[in-house]
Every structure is written in C-alpha cells, then in structure tokens.
C-alpha cells in the first residue's frame, strides 16, 4: 500500500521544469545536474507510479496546491493506469482532489487510513483478523 499527499507532479510541470526545489539534502540532492533541464531527467513520476502496480496507491492532490499541480497528477495517473490495468487492477490507483492548498484534509486522511487497512487486510475487530500462519 502506498499513500502520497501533496507529493509529486511531472518534473516538467514542477515550477515550469525548474527543479531547484528538489535539489536539497532532504530530497534529491543528486538532481543538481538537471536543475535547469528537467527534460533531461531519465525518468518521470508516471514511470514510478506505474512501477507500483498492482499495489493499492492513494494520491491526495489538492486543487490549490502551489507546489504540485493536480492536473499534472491526473496526467501521470492516466499514463500509469494502463499498467495497473495490465495487472487487472486499474481501480487500485485512486486520486483525490480536495479543494484546499498544500494539505491533507481530515476526510482524505481518513480515506487513506481505510485504504491502508484494506491493503493490509487489517481490521480493528480481532475476531475478523485472518488466522496467523505458523512460523516455519
């Protein structure tokens, strides 16, 4: 299970292709060689998201996020969804667009928790937990 909140858009869309925001120790310092040439980066997020198929992937992409464009996320999802479909699970890529800025609103956060629980087959009712397999 993967959950992303305000986490990505196409490198070409990110601040018009200026990758300076990525070039920090806490993110991807090695992107420095591409700072002014996003088109030269040998990957983009549609490929990374496609690689997650068939896992459950929940993406919160707010419509008023100043860092990451929601419509770019939709283009990425459109490009990645056929790979999910090849695995028989196009519905496993779920995109949400709350009307807010760079935030993870409570409704989407709770839905993401449910998505995680579904993916992990977790329940708060111990009588509904799947039986443990013996350790070998």
Model-based region annotation:
Residues 1-48, 67-77, 85-89:
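Mobile cap/lid helix-loop segments that gate and shape the active-site cleft of serine hydrolases
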Residues 45-47, 53-136:
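Alpha/beta-hydrolase-fold serine-hydrolase catalytic core, especially in secreted/extracellular enzymes
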